[in-house]
Amino acid sequence: MPNGLAARLRRETATLHRQAERAGVMRHLLAGRVDRTAYVRLLRALYPVYVELERSLSQHPAAAPASHADLARAPALAADLGHLHGPGWERELLAVPAGVAYAARILAVAIERPPLLAAHAYVRYLGDLSGGQSLGRLVARGLSLAGEAGMAFYHFPAVADVAQCKRAFRAGLDALPFSADEADLVVDEARVAFTANIRVFEAVAC
């Protein structure tokens, strides 16, 4: 059984990962039932999460398993919200408390234990590169979207080969210089991140 950090994260968060896929709005999206209002609210909830994650990783690049600039999602989320809601989305759409709390957790990690940002990068970015690609196709079909308009969140223009990027991301996790105790903390923080995602998905249930 592989014992690298990437394998540990996958193995030891598997139960929470499955729970997240069945939680709130995500359960409906993965079943192909896409409610536009709920989906826009999901993007609104995730926006501050990515803003904080990307700001924190830019300040602590050693915590990033891969180039976070290539994977940054905040600008894509802003573009999708502008397309799906309108240019006044940031003013007109209320922030989702569960998303604000998730972002606050990332900020606290950045201040108190920056290396643990790797856990949040793992949960969000590797998810976006993996199941997120299938989710994007379901959303596009459900909302009758064509091309990248409203779908920027699922497109990675700086990534030429998604499969290779995922392999490099996992290798980057394994190369981070964590002690055994620190690796345990990263796994624990990934569980926190999955729990935060579950709360977001439940908060924007259809």
Where are these regions (language model features)?
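Metal- and O2-centered redox machinery and metal/ROS homeostasis
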Residues: 1-206
